[in-house]
């Protein structure tokens, strides 16, 4: 073998396989990048082009022929052209008969056509073995070698031998083939590169709605109300003070919403007396988004920490502290030290620090590189047991912050309670229901149901 692929980590290194010729139809960015990668890994590459004489920028060592001549050189042909230009393949039906056609194309939008591109290709050339692959790898990644985050290649096809040959090529290129089954899976594979954060939409939309609602709520209480009754201009609070109330409330609410669907699912299973009935679609989607909800919540918690750290350097805080000091000096008064206030203040800060530490720990363990290194019991312990402990600490942090002001009528403005009171509704609800669910009389029944027992079983 004259060349070896530096980036390749193949499972099997068969010399005869590495010397085989691969044909690539199309000389665009992806076709050239894939051809270069194959040349580096020892394959012979033949490009098929409609204008072989005018083709430029191809990797050295590759041969360029017409489509029909190039197809005769190899048993595997990679179709690196768009679906709109597949029609010419019908003219090569006899040449392509019995060959493996690898469809790598993607569409501009999801469900652009009634069938997948691979199925359409199989319909155009019924005598060929069509395999879908390489559509999740970009040309830039192939050229730069930046494949650490995208080494997985989804492969599907109706012919198992053809699919296996393509998967061998994928391995020899240093990538990881993922067998997705028959060609019917091609439609889902083609949707994958076109999706834009599908599991992040609900968390983003929900957090945006919460932030907007809390912003207007705080503006009404802290800006409009003082202006109406006291003629005070508190608009400067919209820069730091109000966001520093919105972010922790949103973080705590989203964290509670991570564990609320699990509580609802447990109640449904107890009510139904079985685990063999499917959850509603909205609950199923909600449970699938829990990781994203938690990470968005962690982001808001980080913002809360950053905004809190800048409080001492704010002009308003320095002015208020200096003005209070001068006033006390003029009046010759001093505030006596309050042990109870010191306890409340230190407890509030300590609970916040511990809660944020566990919050960060939850975020770290949700990373694929970390979650793959622990077993299921360890992962469940961190995400469930420590997760609820995090929720308890963060809720206690907010409760201690409120102190005695929860029941104070002077804290109501236009009969509206402080924003942090709203932020405690969902977390406290989740914790109360969870406390009921972990009681032995309830937990034992729930455990039996999740192990397959049915209340109304006929067997």
UniProtKB/Swiss-Prot annotation:
The record's function comment reads: Integral membrane protein that functions as a NADPH-dependent ferric-chelate reductase, using NADPH from one side of the membrane to reduce a Fe(3+) chelate that is bound on the other side of the membrane. Mediates sequential transmembrane electron transfer from NADPH to FAD and onto heme, and finally to the Fe(3+) chelate. Can also reduce Cu(2+) to Cu(1+). Plays a role in systemic metabolic homeostasis, integrating inflammatory and metabolic responses. Associated with obesity and insulin-resistance. Involved in inflammatory arthritis, through the regulation of inflammatory cytokines.
Sites carrying a glycan are 323
| Cofactor dependence | FAD; heme b
Q: Where in the body, by tissue, does this protein show up? A: Ubiquitous. Highly expressed in adipose tissue. Expressed in placenta, lung, heart and prostate. Detected at lower levels in liver, skeletal muscle, pancreas, testis and small intestine. Highly expressed in joints of patients with rheumatoid arthritis and localized with CD68 cells, a marker for macrophages.
Its domain of life reads: Eukaryota
Protein name listed in UniProt: Metalloreductase STEAP4
- Give the reactions, separated by semicolons, that this protein catalyses: 2 Fe(2+) + NADP(+) + H(+) = 2 Fe(3+) + NADPH; 2 Cu(+) + NADP(+) + H(+) = 2 Cu(2+) + NADPH
The subunit structure is:
Homotrimer. Interacts with PTK2/FAK1; the interaction may regulate PTK2 phosphorylation.
Positions bound to Fe(3+): 217, 307
What positions does the domain Ferric oxidoreductase occupy?
Answer: 247-395
Query: Which residue ranges does UniProt annotate as crossing the membrane?
Result: 202-224, 236-256, 293-313, 342-362, 381-401, 419-439
Residues bound to NADP(+) are 27-30, 49-50, 67, 81-85, 106, 139, 171
What is this protein's expression induced by? By TNF and IL1B/interleukin-1 beta in adipose tissue. Up-regulated by androgens, including testosterone and dihydrotestosterone (DHT).
> Which residues does the record give as FAD binding sites?
140, 148, 269, 290, 366, 383
Q: Which GO terms describe its molecular function?
A: cupric reductase (NADH) activity; electron transfer activity; FAD binding; ferric-chelate reductase (NADPH) activity; heme binding; metal ion binding
């Amino acid at each position: 073998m004259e060349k070896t692929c530096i980036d390749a980590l193949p499972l099997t290194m068969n010399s005869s396989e590495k010397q085989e010729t691969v044909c690539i139809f199309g000389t665009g960015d992806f076709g050239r990048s894939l051809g270069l990668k194959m040349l580096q890994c020892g394959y012979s590459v033949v490009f098929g082009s409609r204008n072989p004489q005018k083709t430029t920028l191809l990797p050295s060592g590759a041969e360029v022929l017409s489509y029909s001549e190039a197809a005769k050189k190899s048993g595997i042909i990679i179709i690196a052209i768009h679906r709109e230009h597949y029609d010419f393949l019908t003219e090569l039906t006899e040449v392509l008969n019995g060959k493996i056609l690898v469809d790598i194309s993607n569409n501009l939008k999801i469900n652009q056509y009634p069938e997948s591109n691979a199925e359409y290709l199989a319909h155009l050339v019924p005598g060929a073995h069509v395999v879908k692959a390489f559509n999740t790898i970009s040309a830039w990644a192939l050229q730069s070698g930046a494949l650490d985050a995208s080494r997985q290649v989804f492969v599907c096809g109706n012919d198992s031998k053809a699919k296996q040959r393509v998967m061998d090529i994928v391995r020899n290129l240093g990538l990881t083939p993922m067998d997705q089954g028959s060609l019917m899976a091609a439609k889902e594979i083609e949707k994958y590169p076109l999706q834009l954060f599908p599991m992040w939409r609900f968390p983003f939309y929900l957090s945006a709605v919460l932030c907007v609602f809390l912003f207007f709520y705080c503006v009404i209480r802290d800006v409009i109300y003082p202006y109406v009754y006291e003629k005070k201009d508190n608009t400067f609070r919209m820069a730091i003070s109000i966001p520093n109330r919105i972010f922790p409330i949103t973080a705590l609410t989203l964290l509670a919403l991570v564990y609320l669907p699990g509580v609802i699912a447990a109640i449904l299973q107890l009510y139904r007396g079985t685990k063999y009935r499917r959850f509603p679609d909205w609950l199923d989607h909600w449970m699938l988004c829990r990781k994203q909800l938690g990470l968005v919540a962690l982001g808001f918690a980080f913002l809360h920490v950053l905004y809190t750290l800048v409080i001492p350097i704010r002009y308003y805080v320095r002015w208020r502290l200096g003005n209070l000091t001068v006033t006390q000096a003029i009046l010759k008064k001093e505030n006596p030290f309050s042990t109870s206030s010191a306890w409340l203040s230190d407890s509030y800060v300590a609970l916040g620090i511990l809660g944020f530490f566990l919050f960060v720990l939850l975020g770290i363990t949700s990373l694929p590189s970390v979650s793959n290194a622990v077993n299921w019991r360890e992962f469940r312990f961190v995400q469930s047991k420590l997760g609820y402990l995090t929720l308890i600490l963060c809720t206690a942090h907010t409760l201690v912050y409120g102190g005695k002001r929860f029941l104070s009528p002077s804290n109501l403005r236009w009969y509206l309670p402080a924003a942090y009171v709203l932020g405690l509704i969902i977390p406290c609800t989740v914790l109360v229901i969870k406390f009921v669910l972990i009681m032995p009389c309830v937990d034992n029944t729930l455990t039996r149901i999740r192990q397959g027992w049915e209340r109304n079983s006929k067997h």
